[in-house]
Amino acid sequence: MAVPALQEKNILLITGPEEYERLHVFPNTYPYVKEDSARILCFKLHEPIQITSVLKEFPRFMVKDFVKSVKGSDFPRFFDNSFSQKEFEHWMEVFYKYRGDLLTGGICIKEYLNLKKYDGKINEYRAFYANNEMISLEPNSGQETFSPAPPAQMLKKYQSVESPFYTVDYAELDDGSWKVIETGDGSVSGLSDRQDYRAFYRSLYLAFS
């Protein structure tokens, strides 16, 4: 249903279409988080990509569209100089097949980061921000609760991105530093597995009260 039709029914969206696109589509968010994010290169869908050119920018890189990757499949986690142009083009065909009708925006090439692991699990946290404050910070990769959390200064730095409700995913690198690895609109971002749902929605309610 279009926004004007919702307004006629006295239904007001917390997040408008422009704000949704700003946080849901990573290249739109990138200008806000690039100081603490992996570097990216963007291409049009089906635009030829020369792997040698990309490798001049990043020694290893991952592939996603403007919203999602195809992790959890047989698609390579990253590409490096061990891949030929022909092999890369084959895998791009696989990528397009796997994403299918869900392809969004274009192709986003992201610098591959070496992430810290604890007992085989990366140390990733998801922060929910609502009305310019962080309302939730939870482990988001199945790691144990004793793993270090992102620096408070970084968490505060991204509490005022131009959207009323969004998420930022943070991950610890091998050297102990932290990076922003993903962002999302709050309405389509999932809660962490062990998160207290009631406490989350209570905090969300209070943020907009």
Locate each region found by the language model:
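Protein kinase-like catalytic core scaffold
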Residues: 61, 135, 166, 179-182
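A conserved acidic, glycine/proline-rich C-terminal tail/linker
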Residues: 154-159, 165
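Short acidic-glycine loop/turn motifs at beta-strand connectors
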Residues: 129-133, 174-176
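C-terminal active-site "lid" helix and adjoining low-complexity regulatory extension at the edge
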Residues: 160-163, 172-209
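Active-site and channel-lining beta-strand-loop segments
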Residues: 125-128, 169-171
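A short glycine-rich, hydrophobically flanked beta-strand micro-motif that places a catalytic Asp/Glu
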Residues: 107-111, 163-174
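Active-site nucleotide/adenylate-binding loops and adjacent lid/helix of ATP-dependent enzymes
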Residues: 4-9, 14-123, 131, 135-156, ...
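Short, surface-exposed coil-to-beta transition loops
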Residues: 1, 120-125, 165-166
